[in-house]
A protein has these predicted regions:
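Bacterial N-terminal signal peptides that target proteins for export
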Residues: 2-25
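Solvent-exposed loop/turn segments at secondary-structure junctions
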Residues: 97, 165-166, 224-228, 259-265, ...
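Catalytic His-Asp segment of secreted/periplasmic serine-dependent ester chemistry enzymes
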Residues: 274, 300-302, 342-429
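Structural recognition of the beta-strand scaffold that forms the well-ordered cores
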Residues: 90, 217-222, 226, 253-258, ...
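Surface-exposed amphipathic alpha-helices with a cationic face
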Residues: 322-330
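Bacterial N-terminal signal peptides
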Residues: 23-34
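N-terminal secretory targeting modules
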Residues: 38-221, 228-234, 429
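Oxyanion-hole/transition-state-stabilizing segment in secreted/luminal serine hydrolases
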Residues: 231, 259, 263-317
Length: 429
């Protein structure tokens, strides 16, 4: 005979209800915690802007540095446009080429206004380990503490750096394509900026990171074409800027590791590409792909005032250089997209470098391009030569894409370069 269970007493019923409510609350708490944890996991630090550090060159080089040899008790304010936005920011200052410690007295950041101004409500003090300043060892970077500042995609930040001591400007980026201001005293928290002088180079500031939901990073590497030498100053019209706009909806950051004067095989206006890939490229968190556009200066500098004593490389020399870059990418499990070299007939004519172009140099460029197209050495290619050349005169840039010096694309040429990149091919999707 099976006995029916005895009915619960009122006290037992109350206890059971309390237990069920507790279980439900615990389950809800665990579920909410899981959601919160999942949300937190979506947020990560990613580089949203960079400028590759360069060493100062000797005064006898053909190009001026455009910056003073040193500053003391001055603030430098620099504007950067980020690719991705976020709710927290870190700044990176570089003493890569300093031979003595760099004393940072103070730093500040905020959303940029006009002519060096900062939106007052967004001004933030930058700290390093909780301190206003820091002593940066030679060769080292200084990474700031995270700071709360909501930054939108494609937003502009004004970064202010106060240098209280006599400070040689040993680490810089020559072709910033953005006005920077010098002012006396500590102006890191000032809304407006009382400038004593300006430049379009960058000093010490090498990277901005944001904490945000992101799907990784694309880095473009190259010379002055990538650095934006033909782009309008203060307009953010480098080809990487247009590419960043295309990738922003996918939450993918774009970093520009171009250096004007950069070369594949030699140093001068910065170290050669292979020597800086680990620092500028492979160290980036969430790296998805790299676009490489380099080699025209290797071909064209020899015999000019830039490299009078150097011999022009052979095709085998160039191929070996590319293969070393490819080998580094493979070792770091990074997708590498090779770009063909654009046409340059008539480049820099009427300047002290009017011998930059020569038919023999152009013949080598075309051989290099043939290898890039046909070797299958890269994971993919983008044919900038085909995009930018004049159909009626293939050795020259399309006039509408030419900045005017017949070497560097202008704003519309840069837009055409970015628009020609198949994003699926770029990312290997």
């Amino acid at each position: 005979m099976r006995l029916a269970p005895a009915p619960l007493t009122a006290k037992e019923t109350s206890r059971l209800g309390s237990s069920i409510r507790s279980a439900v609350l615990i389950a809800a708490f665990v579920f909410a915690s899981t959601l919160s944890s999942a949300h937190a996991e979506e947020q990560s630090w990613v580089g949203t802007w960079m400028a590759s550090p360069q060493p100062i060159w000797k005064p006898d080089f053909a190009l001026p540095t455009k910056i003073p040899q040193s500053v003391k008790d001055q603030t430098i304010r620099q504007v950067v446009r980020v690719s991705l936005g976020g709710d927290r920011v870190r700044l990176v200052f570089s003493n890569t080429y300093g031979d003595q410690p760099l004393r940072i007295g103070a730093a500040g950041v905020g959303l940029a206004g006009e002519n060096g101004a900062v939106e007052p409500a967004t001004i933030r003090k930058v700290t390093f380990g909780g301190k206003d300043g820091i002593l940066v060892p030679p060769g080292a970077p200084a990474v700031s503490d995270p700071l709360d500042l909501t930054v939108g995609p494609q937003a502009k930040l004004a970064v202010s750096l106060y240098l209280p001591e006599e400070t040689p400007l040993t680490t810089f980026h020559w072709d910033g394509r953005q006005t920077a201001w010098f002012g006396n005293g500590d102006l890191t928290r000032a809304k407006d900026f009382a400038a004593t002088s300006t430049t379009d180079a960058r000093m010490f500031l090498s990277e901005v990171l944001v904490e945000t939901r992101n799907n990784g990073t694309v880095v473009v590497v190259g010379d002055s074409i990538t650095d934006g030498n033909g782009a309008t100053v203060d307009a953010d019209t480098r080809w990487s800027d247009f590419l960043a706009k295309r990738l922003a909806p996918d939450h993918i950051a774009v970093l520009n590791a171009g250096i004007s004067g950069g070369r594949l095989l030699q140093d001068k206006m910065g170290v050669n590409v292979a020597a800086r890939l680990q620092r500028d490229v492979f160290s980036q968190p969430g790296l998805k792909a790299v676009v490489l556009l380099i080699g025209i200066n290797d071909i064209s500098w020899p015999g000019t005032d830039f490299a009078a004593a150097q011999q022009r490389p052979t095709l085998d020399d160039m191929i070996a250089g590319y293969q070393q870059v490819i080998a580094q990418a493979r070792a770091n499990n990074v997708r590498l997209v090779g770009a063909t070299l654009p046409p340059f007939e008539g480049a820099l004519s009427g300047t002290p470098l009017d011998d930059y172009y020569h038919p023999d140099k152009d013949a080598l460029r075309r051989e290099v391009n043939r290898w890039i197209r046909e070797s299958n050495a890269f994971d993919a290619i983008v044919d900038f030569d085909a995009i930018l050349r004049d159909p009626d005169h293939p050795a020259r840039l399309v006039p509408a894409f030419d900045s005017g010096d017949h070497l560097h694309p202008g704003d519309e040429g840069n837009r055409a370069m970015a628009d020609a990149i198949d994003l699926g091919v770029l990312l290997g999707r």
